[in-house]
Amino acid sequence: MGETLGDSLIDPESDAFDTLSANISQEVTMVDTEMPFWPTNFGISSVDLSVMDDHSHSFDIKPFTTVDFSSISTPHYEDIPFPRADPMVADYKYDLKLQDYQSAIKVEPVSPPYYSEKTQLYNKPHEEPSNSLMAIECRVCGDKASGFHYGVHACEGCKGFFRRTIRLKLIYDRCDLNCRIHKKSRNKCQYCRFQKCLAVGMSHNAIRFGRMPQAEKEKLLAEISSDIDQLNPESADLRALAKHLYDSYIKSFPLTKAKARAILTGKTTDKSPFVIYDMNSLMMGEDKIKFKHITPLQEQSKEVAIRIFQGCQFRSVEAVQEITEYAKNIPGFVNLDLNDQVTLLKYGVHEIIYTMLASLMNKDGVLISEGQGFMTREFLKSLRKPFGDFMEPKFEFAVKFNALELDDSDLAIFIAVIILSGDRPGLLNVKPIEDIQDNLLQALELQLKLNHPESSQLFAKLLQKMTDLRQIVTEHVQLLQVIKKTETDMSLHPLLQEIYKDLY
């Protein structure tokens, strides 16, 4: 690992660069094969497993030959998402039932995204939305709400008034004047104030839920969005951009966070994932799970750690193509210099893979094979070194990243921001890249304010994760260098060789 960021530039005079640039605009058909278990579910087309055994593609890392950033030069924008068949439906049965791991597949669900009906895309100058517009009002008196209390947004005063009334079982003198309750008058008529609390939906039982009901959230967001659009028309353009990216995201990535979370929480009509926690359950899983990239008779003679590692490689290759397809739908991306498009994808794909991998993880394990299986964290750690070290940093990142409680609409913009990073080594024309990213950052900031009004620091926290992701990729490349030295019979997929070449 002697290279630095400055050493990792792509030589525009080299044959490798010519091959890379040629392949970026030409679809390369790859042979579909089978693989073991890749704990992500977003991808590129498959490549024959026999390539993995071809030692001409070993860790000696040959020149660029097979990058499949296909058809990047053809933009296509669609404002209406196309429904996809759910890839997780299978015609097999799961027999293994483990009480020890039932609790592992339980996490908090993620609320679906909210968007307005506007879909036109614009590129307007940035104007910061007024902070006052983002202040949510108390549903009872109109004062600034301090949070979601007893089922509605309420200020501290009305929250305390309602709590005292309920706990002390207070009964107020009846008033038939239907007094108006607002910030200055709320203490004048306790009867009408309590009736207003009940009328807007405050309930002592609602405290246990802790989260805003989705219908209430959508109504509130609609009110806020309408106010913002009237005073700041540019925000409507940013939300339209966010909707476009979300639609493209849904079409590009089969297993979304919403689907993954539904599986992990048992809130899906599909069968529960088969739990793989040791060698015996792994063997049973190979019989029960429809693995997409493995031919069992050919592969069972290989060591388990190597088979899983090869499966991860193939799933990564699939990921590159889906990320590439998504990138082509980011407004302005296909108009960039072709060489810069290659560079942005080369440096960005693995950061995005690990971002989306977090959606499939909880602290105990990860979904595999399009949600058909669940491989435990402890089993992955038990693989012999250095293979047992590969996934642990991803789990550590996922636990912290998932604590931000992002949904797919947030992730759609975030991964676009990752792709359009103007500080990647070797870029030829940085200015247009930074202009696109600036627009995406504005859309992300507004999206987070609308979708997470209670998390004022979320935007800053999310940007910090971009630094964490780069560190994870650097450590991953370092582990690959260890494998290169210790596993002389191992081979690395040709496409991944090209991406990893001179990468950090």
From Swiss-Prot:
Q: How is its activity regulated?
A: PDPK1 activates its transcriptional activity independently of its kinase activity.
> What top-level branch of life does the organism fall under?
Eukaryota
What's a Gene Ontology MF term here?
DNA-binding transcription factor activity
On whether rRNA processing is a keyword of this UniProt record, the answer is no
Disulfide bridges in this chain: none
For whether the record's keyword set contains Nucleus, the answer is yes
> What InterPro entries does the annotation carry?
1Cnucl_rcpt, NHR-like_dom_sf, Nucl_hrmn_rcpt_lig-bd, Nuclear_hormone_rcpt_NR1, Nuclear_hrmn_rcpt, PPAR-gamma, PPARgamma_N, Znf_hrmn_rcpt
What ranges of residues constitute the NR C4-type zinc fingers?
Answer: 138-158, 175-197
Q: Which residues carry this modification: Phosphoserine?
A: 111
Q: Where is this motif: 9aaTAD?
A: 494-502
A single Pfam family it belongs to is zf-C4
Q: Which GO terms describe its cellular component?
A: cytoplasm; nucleus
Q: Which UniProt keywords apply?
A: Activator, Biological rhythms, Cytoplasm, DNA-binding, Isopeptide bond, Metal-binding, Nucleus, Phosphoprotein, Receptor, Transcription, Transcription regulation, Ubl conjugation, Zinc, Zinc-finger
Describe the processing and modification events after translation.
Phosphorylated at basal conditions and dephosphorylated when treated with the ligand. May be dephosphorylated by PPP5C. The phosphorylated form may be inactive and dephosphorylation induces adipogenic activity. Ubiquitinated by E3 ubiquitin-protein ligase complex containing FBXO9; leading to proteasomal degradation. Ubiquitinated at Lys-251 by TRIM55 leading to proteasomal degradation. Ubiquitinated by E3 ubiquitin-protein ligase STUB1/CHIP; leading to proteasomal degradation.
Q: In which tissues is it expressed?
A: Highest expression in adipose tissue and lower in spleen. Very low levels in kidney, intestine, lung and muscle.
Q: What does this protein do?
A: Nuclear receptor that binds peroxisome proliferators such as hypolipidemic drugs and fatty acids. Once activated by a ligand, the nuclear receptor binds to DNA specific PPAR response elements (PPRE) and modulates the transcription of its target genes, such as acyl-CoA oxidase. It therefore controls the peroxisomal beta-oxidation pathway of fatty acids. Key regulator of adipocyte differentiation and glucose homeostasis. ARF6 acts as a key regulator of the tissue-specific adipocyte P2 (aP2) enhancer.
- Family designation: Belongs to the nuclear hormone receptor family. NR1 subfamily.
Regarding domains, what does the record say?
Answer: The 9aaTAD motif is a transactivation domain present in a large number of yeast and animal transcription factors.
Q: What is this protein called?
A: Peroxisome proliferator-activated receptor gamma
According to its UniProt entry, this protein's organism is Sus scrofa (Pig)
Q: Which gene encodes it?
A: PPARG
